[in-house]
Amino acid sequence: LEFKKIGNEKWSNFCDNKLVFIPSVTTGISYRYAPWGNPEWPRIERNPQQFKERLEFELKYLDKNYRILFITEFNNFFEEALVEPDSKYGFGMLLALKEVLEKYNI
């Protein structure tokens, strides 16, 4: 999350009340079919617990006037970046999302 924190802080500072920064979160991806990318980039593993941690992290960057958070993929089957139920985690991603939204009353 350190990599994401640095980027979010730069964008948040850049916006300085003139633009709205809308953070985004991913469930993570499977690298099985998507081996490309820079090997130095941090891997974004996919599981409900890490998705939940990323959600809670991104909520810190919500604009107080526009409480919007993008989920970058809802059903990207190619990279297995999906929120909807699947054979590996069942309803795990949706339950993680529900838990965080209820915890923060969103």
What is each of the regions a protein language model found here?
Residues 1-50, 61:
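Aromatic-lined glycan-binding groove of carbohydrate-active enzymes
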Residues 12-15, 98-102:
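Surface-exposed amphipathic alpha-helices with a cationic face
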Residues 22, 44-88, 93, 100-104:
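Substrate-binding cleft of secreted/luminal carbohydrate-active enzymes
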